[in-house]
């Protein structure tokens, strides 16, 4: 590709004459010169502002360190300015070489004229009368070949030599220390990762759980106190002969409220525990990247939530004990009411002798124990029923058996 000696003079002349010429080379050289000037101005401005003014105004270790680090940046700007100027000089040299190669090239029309003239003479050289002229034209063509090939070869050598002088641009020096870079990367990764969102969400859930536990504990305490008050009032105001439905309803109400209270406590404790576990796991995984203020807030939140849960458990335990005591008293009253109310007999049973007669025949002999058991504490209460049963047995056939008659 770069061996221009193998190309004929017309080919080299054609390749050199086509294209935009050296105009792009001159334009690129001017651009690099402008860049070199801007870099030199920037380096001078930074040097005058920081390297010289800061140590003079603020003497100390910090200002000296700043001036030292900025000095490396100023040196980098100066080096790039020199490199840009070198590239501009190289482009100038290449443009000059191109102009010289074009100027030393045999024009394309001259080469084509020689070729056409030689071919025409050869066409009429029947007897060799123009052989000398043809040989001279061919010798001129050979000189054209050498001249054009030499011009292209010289241009090639100049371009390779000048471009070899250029140097690569160095990256900018690091003005910030490695420690500050690591801290910045840690903060950026913490703010951009999902773990920070999960941590903030867990903290919010923990605050919500504590608030719900306090609110639910207050409501449960109020409901338990109201239930205990209603049970105590029912125990004091009800008569000994009341029906067992009232005490049973109070007992069911207190048991239901206690169950709901304990169920709410379980759900609150579960949610608070989940929030605590999530917060602990996230805190341990991001302990190396979060700020100390976040860790202190998490520790304070955990302590507050633990104290709130302990207070709520103590209040629920005291409420459960109060409800159990009241329920035991109501159950005792219900037992007495059942033993009394179950033996009340309506007055119209005195006329219903035949159905009682049939029932008495079917009662087994062991019913004497039941009659004896209930007749003791109910003196003066079961007398009408006893008289009815005695009259009914006396009017019948008396096949109830000796045990039944003795019981009656």
UniProtKB/Swiss-Prot annotation:
Q: Name one GO biological process term.
A: response to host immune response
Keywords annotated in UniProt? Repeat
Start and end residues of the sequence repeats are 209-214, 230-235
The organism's place on the tree of life at top rank: Bacteria
Q: Does the keyword Repeat apply?
A: yes
Region 2 X 6 AA repeats of S-V-A-Q-S-E, annotated ranges: 209-235
Record flagged with keyword Oxidoreductase: no
InterPro entries for this protein:
PPE_C, PPE_dom, PPE_sf
Which family does the UniProt entry place this protein in?
Belongs to the mycobacterial PPE family.
Entry protein name: Serine-rich antigen
Gene (UniProt): sra
């Amino acid at each position: 590709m770069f061996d221009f000696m193998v190309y004929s003079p017309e080919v080299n002349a054609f390749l050199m004459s086509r294209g935009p010429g050296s105009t792009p080379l001159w334009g690129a050289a001017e651009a690099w010169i402008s860049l070199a000037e801007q870099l030199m101005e920037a380096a001078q401005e930074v040097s005058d502002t920081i390297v010289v003014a800061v140590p003079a105004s603020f003497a100390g270790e910090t200002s000296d360190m700043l001036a030292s680090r900025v000095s490396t940046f100023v040196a980098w700007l100066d080096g790039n300015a020199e490199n840009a100027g070198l590239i501009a000089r190289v482009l100038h040299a290449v443009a000059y070489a191109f102009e010289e190669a074009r100027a030393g090239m045999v024009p394309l029309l001259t080469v084509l004229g020689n070729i056409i003239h030689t071919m025409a003479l050869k066409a009429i050289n029947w007897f060799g009368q123009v052989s000398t002229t043809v040989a001279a034209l061919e010798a001129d063509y050979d000189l054209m070949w050498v001249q054009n090939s030499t011009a292209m070869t010289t241009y090639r050598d100049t371009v390779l030599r000048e471009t070899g002088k250029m140097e690569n641009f160095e990256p900018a020096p690091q003005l910030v220390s490695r420690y500050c870079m690591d801290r910045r990367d840690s903060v950026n990764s913490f703010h951009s990762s999902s773990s920070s969102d999960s941590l903030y969400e867990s903290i919010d859930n923990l605050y919500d759980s504590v608030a719900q536990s306090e609110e639910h504990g207050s409501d449960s305490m109020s409901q338990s106190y109201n239930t205990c008050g209603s049970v105590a009032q029912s125990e004091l105001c009800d008569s000994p002969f009341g029906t067992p439905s009232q005490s049973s309803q109070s007992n069911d109400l207190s048991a239901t409220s206690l169950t709901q209270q304990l169920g709410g406590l379980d759900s609150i404790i579960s949610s608070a525990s989940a929030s605590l576990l999530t917060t602990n796991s996230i805190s341990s995984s991001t302990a190396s990247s979060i700020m100390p203020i976040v860790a202190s807030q998490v520790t304070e939140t955990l302590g507050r939530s633990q104290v709130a849960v302990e207070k709520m458990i103590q209040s629920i335990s005291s409420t459960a004990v109060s409800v159990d005591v009241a329920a035991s008293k109501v159950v005792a009253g219900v037992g007495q009411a059942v033993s009394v109310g179950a033996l009340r007999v309506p007055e119209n049973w005195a006329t219903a002798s035949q159905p009682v007669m049939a029932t008495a025949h079917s009662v087994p002999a062991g019913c004497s124990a039941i009659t004896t058991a209930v007749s003791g504490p109910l003196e003066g209460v079961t007398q009408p029923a006893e008289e009815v049963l005695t009259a009914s047995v006396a009017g019948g056939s008396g096949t109830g058996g000796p045990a039944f008659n003795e019981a009656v």
